[in-house]
């Protein structure tokens, strides 16, 4: 299924090339910046029944914009960006359906299981999404944190996915090496996730056409979802029509209902 997104940088809805993100902004390559406020996109997604999407704050200076997005559709979108034990509950109260966390549960490149356990105790696993966004190195996928610039020691594989699935309701996984390039999805990663993930996962990165959405739906057996960013027409792209994604979800929902009916 198609999952929408609202990426925020400096208070604006943007699309960036994932591997270029930095706090200073000196090397960040921005492909698109919208004239619409974040709430405009939230209301659009709500109108079209697009559940499971997310709001991501890419760096500081986005709190007001994030609250604008979440407040426009309470309970309709997940939120990620600087989430920690102290503010997770506040973001849920601000309207997030779930909070997305990555960097805070890692210290010095290592997964901090106590921090993860504390967060689960605070908000509950059903309100927690783990971001396992990754980059490929030596033929394997490794979780990256700190604006996707720092490699951790955590490899994304079947054992890790099954282990961490006990602490969250869903995974969000950006293929950082292809994020924002509109040159096609990382099919190897999508195929692997379809085998490894015992819970739903949303993949993001590289989608360039509606065929990528069809591929992820087929390969992922309905458990792996796709976020399309830079290629989408509402984000200035030319590869994918937003209306086609909405129609794909409607058609897929209808087909699934028919196929599972007694």
Regions found by a protein language model. Give the residues of each.
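N-terminal beta-alpha supersecondary unit
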Residues: 18-62
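C-terminal helical cap(s) of enzyme catalytic domains, especially alpha/beta-barrels
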Residues: 111-122, 213-262
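Conserved anion-binding
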Residues: 9-24, 92-178
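Short, acidic/polar
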Residues: 32-45, 84-90, 153-162
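Glycine-rich, proline-tolerant flexible connector loops at the mouths of alpha/beta enzymes
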Residues: 49-65, 103-109, 173-182
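Catalytic cores of alpha/beta
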Residues: 64-99, 188-226, 237, 242
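Conserved, mostly hydrophobic/aromatic
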Residues: 6-7, 45, 53, 91, ...
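Structural preference for beta-strand elements that scaffold enzyme active sites
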Residues: 1-5, 51-54, 76-78, 97-100, ...
């Amino acid at each position: 299924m198609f999952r929408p997104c609202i990426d925020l940088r400096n208070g604006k809805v943007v699309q960036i090339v994932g591997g270029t993100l930095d706090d200073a902004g000196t090397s960040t390559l921005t492909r698109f910046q919208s004239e619409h406020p974040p709430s405009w996109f939230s209301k659009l997604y709500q109108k079209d029944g697009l559940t499971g999407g997310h709001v991501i704050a890419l760096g500081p200076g986005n709190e007001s914009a994030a609250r604008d997005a979440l407040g426009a559709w309470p309970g309709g979108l997940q939120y990620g960006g600087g989430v920690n034990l102290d503010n997770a509950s506040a973001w849920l109260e601000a309207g997030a359906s779930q909070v997305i966390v990555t960097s805070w549960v890692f210290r010095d490149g290592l997964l901090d299981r106590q921090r993860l356990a504390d967060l689960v105790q605070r908000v509950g696993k059903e309100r927690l999404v783990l971001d396992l966004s990754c980059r490929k190195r030596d033929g394997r996928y490794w979780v990256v944190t700190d604006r996707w610039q720092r490699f951790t020691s955590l490899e994304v594989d079947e054992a890790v996915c099954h282990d961490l699935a006990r602490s969250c309701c869903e995974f969000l996984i950006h293929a950082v090496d292809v994020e924002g390039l509109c040159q096609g999805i990382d099919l190897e990663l999508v195929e692997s996730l379809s085998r490894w993930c015992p819970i739903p996962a949303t993949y993001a990165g590289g989608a360039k056409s509606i065929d990528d959405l069809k591929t992820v739906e087929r390969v992922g057996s309905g458990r792996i979802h796709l976020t399309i960013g830079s290629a989408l027409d509402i984000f200035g792209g030319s590869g994918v029509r937003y209306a086609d994604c909405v129609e794909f979800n409607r058609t897929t929902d209808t087909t699934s209902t028919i196929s599972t009916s007694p």
